[in-house]
């Protein structure tokens, strides 16, 4: 009988779909964002749309801006950096470069994976210290060098294997942020 054969398969499919959803929720990293400026809002939106992360919220030292972003976009605003870091598995650091090092060290020492907008820090020594701390604590860290996803780079990828010559131009001034 087809019904007797198909029903258990269909039931298994439904069960496996629900199990997959439950497992996915169980294994999703809880993410938090430090910084709610222009780039911070972009990171918040992208993390919120991701199916790999559960966006827990964000912290911004400017409480007025934090409350504004919370009411405008609906993301939870944490009033202290420690409260946010304690609530997540992964910290996305989108603050001014001068504070990257302190935010990273604080997050790593609390056992959190990190993503840092570029540049990683102001000095090579600070960057090397972050790398060493990540290694000691067996954590993952990544710097936001995302140009590899830029459609222009993707379009010429095949040409890079046998270039005649490559010339690049910077069209905007360096912004130290």
What does each model-found stretch correspond to?
Residues 6-27:
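Hydrophobic alpha-helical signal peptides and transmembrane signal-/tail-anchor segments
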Residues 96, 119, 144-146, 169-171:
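Histidine-centered beta-alpha loop that forms part of the nucleotide-sugar donor binding/catalytic region
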Residues 147-177:
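Predominantly a Rossmann-like dinucleotide-binding segment in NAD(P)-dependent oxidoreductases
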Residues 56, 89, 164:
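Conserved acidic residues
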Residues 129-146, 163-168:
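Rossmann-fold dehydrogenase core element
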């Amino acid at each position: 009988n087809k019904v007797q054969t198909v029903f258990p398969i269909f039931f298994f499919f439904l069960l496996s779909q629900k199990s997959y959803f439950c497992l996915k929720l169980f294994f999703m990293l809880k993410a938090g964002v430090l910084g709610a400026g222009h780039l911070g809002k972009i990171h918040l939106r992208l993390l919120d749309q991701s199916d790999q992360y559960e966006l827990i919220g964000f912290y911004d030292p400017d409480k007025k801006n934090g409350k504004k972003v919370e009411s405008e976009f609906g993301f939870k605003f944490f009033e202290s950096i420690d409260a946010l870091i304690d609530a997540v598995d992964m910290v996305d650091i989108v603050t001014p470069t001068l504070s990257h090092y302190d935010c990273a060290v604080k997050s790593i020492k609390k056992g959190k994976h990190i993503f840092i907008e570029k540049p990683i820090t102001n000095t090579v020594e600070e960057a090397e210290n972050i790398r060493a701390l990540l290694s000691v604590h067996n954590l993952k860290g990544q710097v936001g060098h995302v140009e590899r996803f830029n459609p222009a780079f993707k379009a010429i990828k095949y040409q890079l294997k046998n270039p005649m010559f490559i010339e690049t131009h910077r069209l905007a001034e360096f912004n130290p942020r």
